[in-house]
């Protein structure tokens, strides 16, 4: 997969607000536009392949959940287990490996373009690197929310297809929050790597090594998923603990852990941008 680069100048506050004042006119303060930065990040994101791939991956995960439930349906019905079984089986491999790598590739492709277009240097010259970071964080949060909605939507459709009670679904919907935050944390991690490393290949190699290492640790001790940012999606989905999927305490704990990672990585990203600039 080749990285898509962009050499288009990043929008500044002046370009977002309109033409510059005429010489001799009243002085006008240049205010960085977060909205323009957010819009620009959405515009240049590699959406053409990421969203179809996310739908396909979540569909495959949901298919695994469907088949697992049908294979052991009598045993699950005897335990009165429905949504939690499909949720856990659908998200296990998806959250451990495939979806985190897809999210990472989506973010790394955009990050590699910043170096090719020398966008960080241009933003530093205009003192807009802070606005650029905020725009990236907002776009990453938006993409994370849509990713979480696709995942939850496909699992919901699978459960309804199996005849589960739709009224019970409300207990599981709060999982959208930690899943969104987990995807966001992965994106911010890769954005930070994108400041330190310049090539798409270097970013994805590093991400893959982190993922494999974290996967081995989480299999040995599921609680260790909290210390691995690439493993946060498994923690957010509660894939190892199906009985806790509907637990608000579990949702809150996972959300706090993911949000803490977002904060730490966002600070690292900001510091990295300052050094790069």
Predicted regions and their residues:
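Glycine/small-residue-rich loop that forms an oxyanion/phosphate-binding "nest" at active or ligand-binding sites
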Residues: 109, 120-122
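Secretory targeting signals
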Residues: 25, 49-51, 56-103, 107-109, ...
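Short helix-to-coil transition segments within interhelical loops
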Residues: 122-129
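Terminal transmembrane helical anchor/hairpin motif
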Residues: 3-6, 24, 28-31, 58, ...
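Aromatic- and glycine-rich beta-strand/loop motifs that create alpha-glucan
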Residues: 2-56
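Transmembrane alpha-helical segments in integral membrane proteins
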Residues: 100-115, 193, 198-201, 259-275
């Amino acid at each position: 997969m080749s990285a898509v680069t962009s050499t288009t100048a990043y929008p500044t506050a002046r370009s977002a607000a309109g033409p510059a004042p005429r010489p001799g006119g009243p002085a006008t303060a240049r205010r960085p536009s977060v909205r323009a930065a957010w819009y620009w990040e959405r515009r240049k994101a590699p959406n053409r392949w990421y969203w179809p791939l996310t739908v396909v991956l979540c569909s495959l995960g949901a298919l695994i959940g469907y088949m697992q439930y049908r294979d052991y349906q009598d045993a699950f019905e005897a335990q009165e287990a429905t949504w939690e079984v499909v949720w856990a089986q659908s998200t296990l491999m998806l959250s451990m490996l495939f979806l985190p790598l897809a999210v990472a590739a989506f973010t790394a492709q955009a990050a590699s373009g910043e170096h090719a277009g020398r966008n960080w240097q241009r933003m530093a010259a205009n003192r807009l690197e802070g606005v650029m970071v905020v725009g990236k964080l907002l776009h990453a949060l938006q993409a994370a929310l849509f990713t979480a909605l696709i995942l939850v939507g496909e699992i919901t459709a699978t459960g309804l297809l199996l005849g589960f009670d739709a009224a019970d679904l409300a207990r599981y919907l709060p999982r959208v929050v930690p899943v969104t935050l987990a995807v966001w944390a992965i994106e911010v991690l890769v954005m930070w790597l994108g400041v330190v490393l310049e090539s798409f290949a270097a970013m994805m190699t590093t991400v893959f090594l982190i993922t494999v290492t974290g996967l081995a640790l989480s299999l040995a001790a599921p609680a260790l998923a909290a210390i691995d940012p690439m493993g946060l999606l498994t923690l957010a989905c509660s894939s190892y603990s199906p009985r806790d999927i509907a637990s608000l305490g579990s949702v809150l704990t996972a959300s706090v852990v993911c949000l803490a990672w977002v904060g730490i990585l966002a600070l690292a990203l900001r510091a990295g941008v300052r050094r790069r600039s």
